[in-house]
């Protein structure tokens, strides 16, 4: 069971940049449920997408896997032989807990949990790739390169699921959804101090893009088909499909 997130309930004299360290890993399930609207729905529907897109004898990549929620959702819905899930995160604390979490659930489809920068991972024979609130933490200059790499490593008919916090070109809409997200966090028990301190730590490391920017990158990578399939306030998820049929 996850501990309750109280990391920012008291004033912090020096707020550094956000890191996914042991303290965050310990409370991460509670933190993300109370901070990201629609997170549980996205996780469960990633499993539904896996049932539709994962091909026999192929690989699934969960890039930025944190504690493995998306990996487990995929594995519950893979019914083909010869498949493998590769879950990657660069946080030692997340990887250690992810391995324990994955090992607690037995299933036919093997999972390899790798501690590494997702930019170092070779994508090959992939029928599905998941970037679940991960791309926003990469240097913007590296985002197109990663999407290009994913497209090249996907099999025809394969899919990329890209979940992100969004910015908005329309400032009125952006402010409305920003405020509604803060209302959501308040309703989930976060104080103004907690919200403010966490935002200050994230603002230099989590750089968001608009849906239009994401779609433009996906097109540039080679994806002919992409669409927003889920959105709640300023959070959402896109699916991009590589053209052609699975062999």
From Swiss-Prot:
The EC number(s) this enzyme carries: 2.1.3.-
Q: Which CDD domains match?
A: AdoMet_MTases
Which catalysed reactions does the entry list for this protein? prephenate + S-adenosyl-L-methionine = carboxy-S-adenosyl-L-methionine + 3-phenylpyruvate + H2O
Task: Tell me where the signal peptide lies.
Answer: none
> InterPro entries recorded for this chain?
CmoA, Methyltransf_25, SAM-dependent_MTases_sf
Q: Which GO terms describe its biological process?
A: tRNA wobble uridine modification
Q: Self-association or partners: how does it assemble? A: Homodimer.
Among PANTHER family, the record links this protein to: CARBOXY-S-ADENOSYL-L-METHIONINE SYNTHASE, TRANS-ACONITATE 2-METHYLTRANSFERASE-RELATED
What's the protein here called? Answer: Carboxy-S-adenosyl-L-methionine synthase
Species name: Cronobacter sakazakii (strain ATCC BAA-894) (Enterobacter sakazakii)
- Give the organism's phylogenetic lineage: Bacteria, Pseudomonadati, Pseudomonadota, Gammaproteobacteria, Enterobacterales
